[in-house]
Amino acid sequence: NLKEICDEIFGPNCFVSNISWQRTYSKRNDSKGIPAEIEHILVFSKRGQWIPKRLQRTATMDEGYSSQDGDEHEWSSVTISAPGAATHQGMVYAIQHPITGELLYPPLGRCWSFGQAQMLECMNEWTDYELRIINDYEKRCEICGSDRGVSKETNAIMLKKPFETAQAEALNRYNQGIKKERPWPLLYFTAKGKGGLRRKQYLNK
């Protein structure tokens, strides 16, 4: 076993990774048995606890970062959804927009990137929210691509206060960011506060 031999030579604490790569990509019909298309490269470091040297950031990499809401840290806009709705059904639920009242869902086949507790915490920075059953089973099945395993009752993140009150608070919060008086929360709304939900990705993260 090459791994065991290398462990004796370099020390098991210097093992970094076993890199597997497929050396043949084109289809072949001349095999006389089971072809060995995968090769392995064992990587060891001179010293234990090896950390790769990261590339320095360039000005081009930083071009997409700014602070349009007066945040002391520059950020870029990234999606707040991730693939895998079918396998993360508990992360598929509605979030009520505080300014339009619309119910926001992840795109088809996707789920929210954060767990519901964290999403609720983020939304509470706009106005008061609560968890509530709204009977949107069919909509969640549509997003997950199937009704298999989808819970009949999943909480949505809904406005706790009357809509007019919540809307006024959220609009004030949004305008504070426009005036750069107070940065927007981690999750913010596009299209002058009336669009979809996005996440701030900070430059130093």
Regions found by a protein language model. Name each.
Residues 1-205:
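Class I S-adenosyl-L-methionine
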